[in-house]
Regions:
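Conserved beta-strand-loop-beta-strand hairpin that lines the nucleotide-binding pocket
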Residues: 1-118
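Intrinsically disordered, charged low-complexity linkers and terminal tails
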Residues: 23, 87, 106, 138, ...
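Short acidic/polar alpha-helix capping motifs at helix-coil junctions
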Residues: 28-29, 123-125, 211-213
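Intrinsically disordered, low-complexity boundary segments flanking structured domains
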Residues: 61-62, 92-95, 123-131, 190
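A general structural signal for short secondary-structure boundary/capping elements
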Residues: 63-66, 121-123, 216-218
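Short, conserved, surface-exposed binding loops centered on an aromatic residue
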Residues: 96-98, 130-134, 162-164
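Short, cationic low-complexity segments
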Residues: 119-142
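Amphipathic alpha-helical interaction surfaces in cytosolic regulatory modules
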Residues: 141-218
Length: 218
């Protein structure tokens, strides 16, 4: 793209920022750079953190930590919307995304917010004295999309597990996932876990059916 713009608005209670450009869209850019099948899969990879197509210029941490610093973080591109809200502590795809040319980012934070960037770093690091990016979170609802596909196959398990060996701890959030297949669970919780024993996988927000399938795989 050739054009970019930004806007800052401060009202009585919040600071709002909007940044946009007219490029190809961040998810399409990542899809092309990393030979990923779809923009939605590119969104999933971006949400994990440590993903950059230009490592000489940035580390790939910016989106992950910025989305957790602000109260509301919305990323619009390629007919997809990635959203993260501080109070719900979750990530999701919007069913009716905003159609924009290029990429648009909206961020909002209450003027009364007290959390600091150091606190955000510490929540995903080895400890208070080491801010290395060691912990990530993967919202599995991002893998099923707004249409609600199921997580059944071994290939889907590999897609979720891709690059997780770059982290020491991974929280797998099953919020919004009603069921998973045996192949998916086995690939993620047995095959990947045995190949990368240094990575601690934690499954949370599971219903009884999902928990039983995960326990069987382990």
């Amino acid at each position: 793209g050739r054009l970019s713009s930004g806007m800052v608005l401060v009202d009585r209670t919040h600071l709002h920022l909007l940044i946009r450009d007219d490029g190809c869209g961040v998810f399409a850019r990542i899809q092309e750079a990393f030979a990923i099948d779809t923009p939605q899969q590119a969104l999933l990879e971006l949400s994990k953190g440590k993903l950059t197509s230009q490592p000489e210029f940035h580390t790939g941490r910016g989106l992950f930590f910025t989305s957790r610093l602000f109260d509301v973080f919305d990323l619009y591109a390629n007919h997809l919307t990635y959203q993260h809200s501080h109070w719900q502590r979750r990530e999701w795809l919007r069913a009716n995304p905003l159609a924009v040319q290029g990429t648009a980012v909206f961020m909002s934070i209450a003027l009364s917010a007290t959390r600091t960037l150091d606190e955000v770093f510490a929540a995903h690091s080895r400890g208070s004295q080491d801010f290395s990016f060691a912990r990530t979170e993967v919202a599995l609802r991002l893998a099923i999309g707004a249409e609600g596909q199921t997580l059944e196959s071994r290939a889907q398990g590999k897609r979720i597990a891709h690059r997780l060996e770059a982290f020491e701890e991974v929280d797998l959030d099953f919020d919004g996932i009603d069921a998973i297949g045996q192949g998916f669970a086995d690939e993620l919780f047995r095959v990947f876990a045995r190949q990368h024993p240094q990575v601690q996988l934690r499954a949370r927000n599971m219903n009884d059916q999902v928990a039983a399938m995960v326990a069987q795989a382990r």
